[in-house]
Structure formats: C-alpha cells, structure tokens
Amino acid sequence: MAQERDTHHALLIPLGHFAQEIGLISGIEAVKLSQKIYDHTPQAKVLEFFVAVLSGTQHLQDISLAGHPLDKDLAVAEAWKQMCWVDYTSVSRAMKQLNWNESKAIASVLEHVSQPFWDSELAVLRSQGCGLQYDGDLTGLPVSNTSRTYPNAAYGHMSDEIRLGYQAAVVSFHSPTYGRLWLSVDHHAGDTVSCTQAEALVLAAEKRSGQHPKRRTELLQKRIKNFVKSREPADERFCSQQAALAAAEQAKAETLEKLRAAQEIPETKPKRLQTLERRGKRYEKAIEVARKKLSKTQVWLNAHVEQEKALRKRLLQFERENIENPQPIEACFRLDAGFGTYDNIALLIEMGYELYVKLHNHKIVEQLKQSVTPETAWTHVGNNAEMVAWPEMQLKSCPYPLDIALERFYTGKTQKHSALAHFGSTPVTTNLPTWFGKYNARQTIEAGIKETKQVFFLNRLKVRSEPAIYLQEVMTIFAANFIRWATVWIEQHVDQDENTLPVGEMGIKKQIQVAANTSAKVIQNSEGMLLRFSPASVFAGKQLFFRASRKPPRSTHFLPFFTILDLIAQKLR
C-alpha cells in the first residue's frame, strides 16, 4: 500500500537517504556525548544542526520560525532516520554543551565518511598520471564589534576591514569527478595572519589526503651548506671583537695601574694624573662599545645556529618521510600574497611542491618596476593585464631562484602592479598567459569561500561556544562536499525520463536555496520512491524516482563502498 507525505524541503529527502548510504547518520549516532537524554538524543540534535546547515538556514531559529519550519517536516526526519525533529532551542542547547573532544570526535566522523571519496579521486588522478592541485586561504568570520559573548574572538583583517571575529584556514582540492572539494578547515582567532599559517595549511592537506610529494632534500642539504658558510664572516667578526674587547680591558687595566702608581708618588704632576684618568675613561667607553658589538654579534650567531639546527632537524625529518613514502605524488599549491614570505616559499619548495604565489614583500615590486625600461616588451595576458617575467631570478632573501613576473593591471583608471613567483618544472616564463591563467585559477577557492558564506551562511555563526563554532565550520565545508557527492549519486540511481529533475545540471546554489526548500509529495511502496514536485513549485511537473531494486549503475565510482539505496516507494504515472 502506498504511503504519502508532503514536504517543503524536497531535495533533503534523497540527501537523507544518501547520508544513510555513506554511514553519516550511524557515524554521528555512535559518537559519545556527555549530555542528558530526554525525548531526543544529543546526537539527533547535532544531526539536525547539520541538516539545517545543508538546507542553507541563515539563523538557527529558522529551524522553527521559518515560513516552512524544518522541525515540522516529518518526511525529512524520516529520510534522515529520525522519528521527528526538535525545536531550535533544544538544538542550540545541545550544541552549546559540546566540548572540544566531542566536536573533534564528530569532525572525525565526517572525515571518515569522506575518506572513500578521497581515495577514489586519488586513484583516478594516479591512473591519469596527474598530480594534486591544492589552493589555500584564510577567510574571516566577523561578528558584531560590540559583542562580548563570542569566546576568544579577536580583532583582525576581514574583507578589507578591521573586525572582531575568527579566521578559518581552508584548503581546497581539485577533483576530476566533482570539481572543487574542501580538504580541511582550521579554526583561529580573528587576529591570525596568513603568513603564519602556510605550513599548517600544507600539513593539514597532507594529513587529510594521506599523500605528499617527494621532499627536495638535495636542495635543503645545499641550503644548509651555504647557510653555514654564510656564518663565517660573523664568526671572524666575533673573534676580532673578542680580541678588541680583551685589548681594551687590558689597556684599561694597565692605565689604572699606572694611575695608582702615579698617585703614590708625591712628585707626580696633576696634569699627568688627569691624563691617565681621561685615558681610563676612554678605555671604559671603548670596553662598553666593544661589549655591545660582541653581544649583538653573539645574539645573531645564536639565532643563526638555532636556525641551522632547525634546518638540520627538517632535513632529518624529510629524509625519513622520503623513505616512508615510496610512491610520492606530484602536487601544486597556489597561495595569495598573504602567504608569500620568503620563509614560506622556501619551506614549500623543500616540501616538494610546485608553487604559484604572489610575493608578500611589496619592495620587490618597486625593484622590478625599476628594472623595466620603455623598451621592455610586455605580454598581454588578460583583459586589462600585462606581464613581464624573469626566469630563475635569485632574490636577496630567498635561498632558491624563482621564476618572477611583474604584472600590471587597471582597476578603473588606476594602474596597479604585483609580483608573481613560481617554482617548479613548468617553464612558465615561456608562456605568460598560461602562467597568469594558472595562478588566477585559484579564484576557485575564493568562489568556494563565497559559496560557504552565501549558500551555507558560514559567516552567520549560529552558535556561541567555540567548540560549536568550530563544528559549524567543519560541517559547512562537509556540506559543500556532501552535496557534490550526492548529486553524482542521484544521477546514478534515479530513473531518467522526460520528467526527471536534472539535478546534475543545477548549480549548488539552486540545489540548496531552491530545490532543498521547495514543496513536493513523497510517495512510496514496494516499487520504489517517487519525489513529485508540487504544482506550486518552480519544478512543477518534475520528479525524482528511485527504484527499490538494483539497477546497473551508470558509473562504477560508488561500487567499492556503497550499497544500493534500499527505498520503499511507488511511481505515479
């Protein structure tokens, strides 16, 4: 017998069944949370919070107070294996009571659920002989500047303003099947700056993907050798300064001895005593100056030695990692100017990455501009952009030669310049339009950040405890990945006819803000499930039908880790 239910969140129905298939619901339910249980478990409330994020809810209260409240939609609750949903206040209390260990345990579930997708995409890339393409960035999550209820919020640069809030460090990855996918997010105070986070971004990407390139230990060995050699002038200066100090102290001692001897002789003229006293004071000042010089050199040498120790420690670590990584992958990282310090550039080079970055030091732009003459041939690379480049340029403070380009472009009537840097085997200086396009393709992460804020509303923090804020960040990037995985899954399992809603042809924004918030009728019996969009919906006349029996899949992508959607439903004709 057919069962029918109405829903105002149509796309959340198949998304719920997809969540069952990949083990998301059972994974969250298995996390131990130290909260009292009344009618609903805290795990169910955490799951409801995720569904709210997935549906593009702007404010937590919209769960109960929106035009079509999520907590009244029993069809969605059943699709997500819940008897019903709870009021938003209960969700808020459950999220507030989460501690850091519990939030991280839930985040680990999301990582575990995601792992088969990463493994599959990495296998595809290996089969195609392609490397990994990463993009990293730091994005601000501002709150009201007058707020005092957000723990550990701090003032920092956010969207060209100084705002109170937090920073989220994110890494995205280009997937051959799904396009942009998020790899990681790390929660930081609002005063965190990009230049301190480059290494953390790379390590987070490597931890999440389980892959890293071959470390360039030969370059690091050469760097250490040159680094030690660069200390030789300072060592010589230190020795000469020690000798100068000793000579000054000896001269002072001799002068004071002469002064004492002269004072014991009654016949000594006052002028002689005055001369010796002045000479002693001069030596005293000379000793003070010599000590300051020696101390300054000693501090520099100590810092230099400590840096050498750090480099040697890095070398040992990288050599060990190369031994433990018999099948390294090739990988590329793109970063904006905030990360482009010489130390960060050197580190990423030594870690084995091909690197595309803008330089952090604005002085290099002025130096490059001085190298340009009226006869310099500029290459047109974009609508309003031109570039000139120098291969393997050795910058003063960078241990490795870089491909350097000076870019000039217009914003309105104002001409601006920036410096791009590249390290890797790609001969970028022979094709500047390709270099320009490759670097600016990092706009994909900027588009991804925009999506998290304008589709999933990450910029509207729905909770005020820091562990819960972190979990909202994690759930938001997971939701962005989840909808992409689910779109392919729906296309593989839905019956295709002229009335089928083309979910795969819809953008993510339309899927979330429209399809996940529109009305439909859910009809099911032994044949399968039919999601028929209502006549009042923008998708009137469209439907999604899933058969209960297995169909030959259109792709084998999910076969290693999915079972077929086991639904009970009826197709209306």
Labelled PLM ranges:
Residues M1-T7, I25-R573:
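Anion-binding and metal-coordination hotspots
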Residues M1-Q20:
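N-terminal basic/disordered segments at the start of proteins
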